[in-house]
Amino acid sequence: MRMIIKNGTVIDGFGSEATADILIDYGIIKAIDKNIQVSDGIVIDATGKYVLPGFVDMHTHLRQPGFEEKETIKTGTEAAATGGYTTVACMPNTNPPIDNEIVVEYVKSIAQREGVVKVLPIGAMTKGMKGEEITEMAKLKKAGVVALSDDGFPIMSAGLMKRIMTYGKMYDLLMITHCEDKALSGEGVMNSGVISTMIGLKGIPREAEEVMLARNIILAKSTGVRLHIAHISTKGSVELIREAKEKGVKITAEVTPHNLTLTDEAVYNYDTNTKAYPPLRTREDIEALIEGLKDGTIDAIATDHAPHTKDDKKVPYDMAAFGISGLETAFSVINTFLVQTGKITIKELVNYMSINPAKILGISSGIKVGSIADIVIVDPYEEYVVDKDKFKSKGKNTPFHGMRLKGVVDCTIVEGEIKYKKDRKTEKVEV
């Protein structure tokens, strides 16, 4: 199907920003120029809007198989398209976990049949994600995983982690690690500090993240594996990764929108939708994380989309599930708090949310002639009020509910097909 995007400000991901038209035919970008004329096809007017490479989320929980009451591949990818994502990498903490080629094929087949955007499976490091026996990496890679991770179940044994990294290096697989020392995090549920003491909740010290991160950096340097650090949250973690990069360690890192914008002060009213791992930290940490993005220490912004049922969250804070539903608010949150305030540019947003995560995962991204037409059109200035009840995701667990944000996804195009288009007749900005 032929399509033309007219008069948008195209940020291609390669340094260029210009008002232009984009001609798409059979899912491929055929031309980028001014005043392109065609006799047939779909015409999208992008006047006053940015036309960007589709966002790539390298940390999504789609929950299927096993936890379909929280999310399915269908609802999760619908949420992704609504948020401007054209590709998501799904974590292996399903039931059964993505720890063998059969489950990989299941996820791929459901995604092919019911998915709205492209889904890249991440395989488990250990069988059953129990941290005991290494998975068959060669079979997982052949089946199509883009990385290995035990997600929120950190490998506590340094010896086992070294063996995993050694095999990972052998098969050229990206290792994604959740850095948490369970002996330090214990039963903590929020950032350890003044506020946790004031409101009587058990704290998670920053050392729980930083000690495990330091260990994994040492092992990555020793083995030469490609290491990616999931959702960092502390100033100390930024410093450790910066130093590791300076020493030539093959390391990349991501940070979430909520850890870039919210502090532990948001937990004051015991809203369980603020409960995530890692926890919301302090203003000093946020400033360090933003600086880490700016200087290249942190490579990507990832949602860690973790949908839960209402029952998972409608309990006392210390009993509530960790996790935030983030696919549908990520762009708006980053645009509102970082771009519109001048902390980062829209070009940098494109790097953090599209170009860099794609590069880390080994896939293509960017707008150029001959490339696949994975595109998002956004209005960076339109405002709206977040309404969790309008989420496509089954997970309504967002700390941004009721917040006025600036920046709206207008259209998401995957391989030349419109997968989401904002209905401006029915969706009004709440006043």
Curated annotation (Swiss-Prot):
<dbReference type="InterPro" id="IPR011059">
    <property type="entry name" value="Metal-dep_hydrolase_composite"/>
</dbReference>
<keyword id="KW-0862">Zinc</keyword>
<dbReference type="Pfam" id="PF01979">
    <property type="entry name" value="Amidohydro_1"/>
</dbReference>
<comment type="function">
    <text>Catalyzes the reversible cyclization of carbamoyl aspartate to dihydroorotate.</text>
</comment>
<feature type="binding site">
    <location>
        <position position="308"/>
    </location>
    <ligand>
        <name>substrate</name>
    </ligand>
</feature>
<keyword id="KW-0479">Metal-binding</keyword>
<comment type="similarity">
    <text>Belongs to the metallo-dependent hydrolases superfamily. DHOase family. Class I DHOase subfamily.</text>
</comment>
<dbReference type="InterPro" id="IPR002195">
    <property type="entry name" value="Dihydroorotase_CS"/>
</dbReference>
<dbReference type="GO" id="GO:0006145">
    <property type="term" value="P:purine nucleobase catabolic process"/>
</dbReference>
<keyword id="KW-0378">Hydrolase</keyword>
<protein>
    <recommendedName>
        <fullName>Dihydroorotase</fullName>
        <ecNumber>3.5.2.3</ecNumber>
    </recommendedName>
</protein>
<dbReference type="GO" id="GO:0004038">
    <property type="term" value="F:allantoinase activity"/>
</dbReference>
<dbReference type="InterPro" id="IPR006680">
    <property type="entry name" value="Amidohydro-rel"/>
</dbReference>
<feature type="binding site">
    <location>
        <position position="151"/>
    </location>
    <ligand>
        <name>Zn(2+) 1</name>
    </ligand>
</feature>
<comment type="pathway">
    <text>Pyrimidine metabolism; UMP biosynthesis via de novo pathway; (S)-dihydroorotate from bicarbonate: step 3/3.</text>
</comment>
<feature type="binding site">
    <location>
        <position position="178"/>
    </location>
    <ligand>
        <name>Zn(2+) 2</name>
    </ligand>
</feature>
<feature type="binding site">
    <location>
        <position position="59"/>
    </location>
    <ligand>
        <name>Zn(2+) 1</name>
    </ligand>
</feature>
<feature type="binding site">
    <location>
        <position position="151"/>
    </location>
    <ligand>
        <name>Zn(2+) 2</name>
    </ligand>
</feature>
<dbReference type="InterPro" id="IPR004722">
    <property type="entry name" value="DHOase"/>
</dbReference>
<feature type="binding site">
    <location>
        <position position="304"/>
    </location>
    <ligand>
        <name>Zn(2+) 1</name>
    </ligand>
</feature>
<dbReference type="InterPro" id="IPR032466">
    <property type="entry name" value="Metal_Hydrolase"/>
</dbReference>
<dbReference type="GO" id="GO:0005737">
    <property type="term" value="C:cytoplasm"/>
</dbReference>
<feature type="binding site">
    <location>
        <position position="231"/>
    </location>
    <ligand>
        <name>Zn(2+) 2</name>
    </ligand>
</feature>
<feature type="binding site">
    <location>
        <begin position="322"/>
        <end position="323"/>
    </location>
    <ligand>
        <name>substrate</name>
    </ligand>
</feature>
<feature type="binding site">
    <location>
        <position position="93"/>
    </location>
    <ligand>
        <name>substrate</name>
    </ligand>
</feature>
<feature type="binding site">
    <location>
        <begin position="61"/>
        <end position="63"/>
    </location>
    <ligand>
        <name>substrate</name>
    </ligand>
</feature>
<dbReference type="GO" id="GO:0044205">
    <property type="term" value="P:'de novo' UMP biosynthetic process"/>
</dbReference>
<feature type="binding site">
    <location>
        <position position="61"/>
    </location>
    <ligand>
        <name>Zn(2+) 1</name>
    </ligand>
</feature>
<keyword id="KW-0665">Pyrimidine biosynthesis</keyword>
<dbReference type="GO" id="GO:0004151">
    <property type="term" value="F:dihydroorotase activity"/>
</dbReference>
<dbReference type="GO" id="GO:0008270">
    <property type="term" value="F:zinc ion binding"/>
</dbReference>
<dbReference type="InterPro" id="IPR050138">
    <property type="entry name" value="DHOase/Allantoinase_Hydrolase"/>
</dbReference>
<feature type="active site">
    <location>
        <position position="304"/>
    </location>
</feature>
